[in-house]
Amino acid sequence: MITQIDRKAIRMKKHKRVRKSVFGTAERPRLAVFRSLNHIYAQVINDELGVTLATASSLDAEFKAAELAGGNVEGAKKVGELVAKRAQEKGVSKVVFDRGGNIYHGRIAAVAEAAREAGLEF
């Protein structure tokens, strides 16, 4: 009998493994990306204090004003730009990238590249 692969469980296992080494500090907070089927979310987190410094998602008003979809690469680029802009307003210029167990490809890579182009260093 063929068993179906539980992709979410595999992703969560990878995410736990990566989180052992990726930790956000006050100097370099963590840029965490979460991808769902229709939306994408990004947060800049200081893990020492347990505080979220900046957020952006495809559900934000600024994103919806641009009339983009969150489930594609163009939308992910816009989310990357938004989170970088909001992080810089809070005085954050360097971050550690947390891909959340996802493969660095497609929407995850688009968020990272757009954040780099907007001025975040990682």
Swiss-Prot record:
SUPFAM superfamilies reported in the protein's UniProt record: Translational machinery components
Keywords tagged on the record: Ribonucleoprotein, Ribosomal protein, RNA-binding, rRNA-binding
Single GO MF annotation: structural constituent of ribosome
Statement: the UniProt record of this protein carries the keyword Ribosomal protein: yes
Record-linked Pfam families: Ribosomal_L18p (PF00861)
GO terms for biological process, alphabetical: translation
Domain of life, source organism: Bacteria
Physiological role: This is one of the proteins that bind and probably mediate the attachment of the 5S RNA into the large ribosomal subunit, where it forms part of the central protuberance.
Family: Belongs to the universal ribosomal protein uL18 family.
The protein's name in its UniProt record: Large ribosomal subunit protein uL18
Gene: rplR
